[in-house]
């Protein structure tokens, strides 16, 4: 059979939930919504104030810290991402690739990865604020990540960007300067990808 044995396709395989994918999914989602923050009509300080006054964010951040403790104590990072005997010969998104490029030491890679998980959750919370529809949609992507193997950046490429724009288009103010920064962000990403795979 050509079906990936690690992908959950039947009810009796639910014990194979890939909980570690929640962190990697968050980095992929955050990567695509980060440049959209520059398009907000209101300044960043306004949204920062909303972020810190929203009690729901503290719940999400607390859950993310609990998740980090769970992953740190249960994930064999070397087996999962190490160059030798790894479950992943590809995938895991930009955070994994950047960690490989900048850190030879596996412990530093692991530290960088977990910090990236946490920062990504903060970015996502900052973006969605109190919007229930946004929360539900992004929750859908997190749930999907539990079933997929391998989890790859391509799964989130255009879908996340278009979804985020459609959800908050009324709160965006687009001009040439902001558009230039936006395209520069993804152009840098494209160049980096080309260099990585050369």
Label each residue range with its predicted role.
Residues 1, 139-147:
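Membrane-interface alpha helices of multi-pass inner-membrane proteins
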